[in-house]
Regions:
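Short coil/turn segments at secondary-structure boundaries
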Residues: 66-77, 90-91, 106-113, 126-129
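A generic, well-ordered mixed alpha/beta core segment in the N-terminal half of proteins
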Residues: 108-150
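His-Asp-centered metal-binding catalytic motifs of divalent-metal-dependent phosphohydrolases/nucleases
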Residues: 93, 97-119, 138, 198, ...
Length: 386
């Protein structure tokens, strides 16, 4: 049997010198005895999977509202796809797969219901009350809001490396605040991989959901050079008339193209930098990222994002749903701020303990699923629901 020490020895033997190692973790804020047959990063992964915030992701919107279709991505299915991509990339680069997976699984825990429209609404509502950003909220969840291990410690007591990875997880939608959670260290390579696994996943699966919903047309997709390239490859390998199979193959090709370019360019960058150990990675201050797409391919990815923004995210169908969502999130927020006793007792208790009301209301609403938020809205404002 491979116990923890043997697993750590396997990491030492097979990972690159610049990869994070469980056996050299900085540790946890609240010291704990090590597990017999799991490394600290494997233990973090398991804690994330078993926490309530992770389960709630299954009823949180990615692009299309949860009740609009059974096959559209939710935050949970997106998260699983990100973790899978991160492990694949980490394995190819001889990085720590378990750390990449743990960061990937936790990266969206702090998202509000109703996708990016919900996050934008919450940012506006919290603008003068300490701010809101979903990466910072993910850290609040794993550090404070999850209650599985009280009274031993608040939150999940994750390792420094996983928390650091969440702090450094930045996408085009994010402008991290992280007040009181800053660090001078740069991101680990594993954190950078999780970041790109997120981007690769939503670039591909938003195309999948968009075409499946018929909001995104094939003609519109071809405005992206990368989409057109993936479609040409798929059509050469799929029989005429097999539209679903064609869509699947386009999405697969989009993922393959992104991962292949990322691996090739990152391998070149690692060779150029010649990092001797993890400390060199964390101290890196170069202008050119280490984990990245090649410049030419990055332009293609940007074109794909522009197409998705114009043709899918800003489509009448998606905007109509999101505008409605924004309106009722604001109404709920304002009602709970003015009458906080309408929230569950645990949240009221936090206000009594002098946690700011706006922050508590933010925590409550950000933790809601689409379905629960819809039910709470009805209870607050529908005279026929009690």
């Amino acid at each position: 049997m491979n116990d923890r020490k043997q697993l750590e020895a396997i990491e030492d033997a097979h990972l690159a010198p610049y990869a994070m190692r469980a056996g050299k973790s900085v540790g946890r804020a609240f010291p704990e005895a090590e597990h017999e047959y799991r490394t600290c990063f494997q233990r973090d992964r398991d804690r994330i999977i078993h926490c309530a915030a992770f389960r709630r992701l299954q009823y949180k919107t990615q692009v299309f509202l949860n009740w609009e279709g059974d096959h559209f991505r939710t935050r949970l299915t997106h998260t699983i796809e990100v973790a899978q991509a991160a492990r694949t990339i980490a394995r190819a680069l001889a990085l720590n797969e378990d750390l990449c997976e743990a960061v990937s699984l936790a990266h969206d825990l702090g998202h509000t219901p109703f996708g990016h429209a919900g996050e934008h609404a919450m940012r506006d509502l919290m603008r003068d009350h300490g701010g809101y950003e979903h990466n910072g909220q993910s850290l609040r969840i794993v550090d404070e809001l999850e209650r599985h291990y009280q009274p031993r410690f608040p939150g999940l007591n994750l390792t420094h490396e996983v928390r650091h990875g969440l702090m450094k997880h930045v996408t085009d939608y994010d402008k991290p605040l992280f007040k009181g959670l800053t660090t001078r260290e740069g991101p680990s390579l594993e954190a950078q991989v999780a970041n790109f696994a997120d981007e690769i996943s939503y670039n591909a699966h938003d195309v999948d959901d968009g075409i499946d919903s018929k909001v995104l047309t094939w003609q519109a997709g071809r405005k992206s050079e990368l989409f057109a390239e993936a479609e040409a490859f798929a059509r050469a390998n799929v029989p005429e008339g097999e539209d679903d199979l064609l869509r699947y193959q386009v999405v697969r090709r989009l993922k393959d193209l992104q991962v292949s370019d990322l691996l090739a360019h990152t391998a070149r960058r690692l060779k150029e930098e010649g990092f001797s150990d993890v400390r060199a990675v964390l101290a890196y201050e170069g202008k050119e990222p280490v984990v990245d797409f090649s410049p030419a391919f990055k332009a293609k990815v940007k074109g794909l994002k522009v197409m998705l923004f114009n043709e899918l995210y800003m489509s009448r169908t998606v905007r109509r749903s999101m505008e409605k969502v924004t309106r009722f999130m604001r109404q709920m927020f304002e009602r709970f701020v003015s009458e906080p006793y309408l929230m569950p007792g645990g949240f009221v208790k936090r206000i009594e303990q002098r946690v700011r009301t706006h922050r508590v209301v933010c925590d409550y609403i950000a933790g809601m699923t689409d379905r629960y938020a819809k039910e709470q809205y009805k209870k607050l404002f529908d005279p026929d629901v009690w």
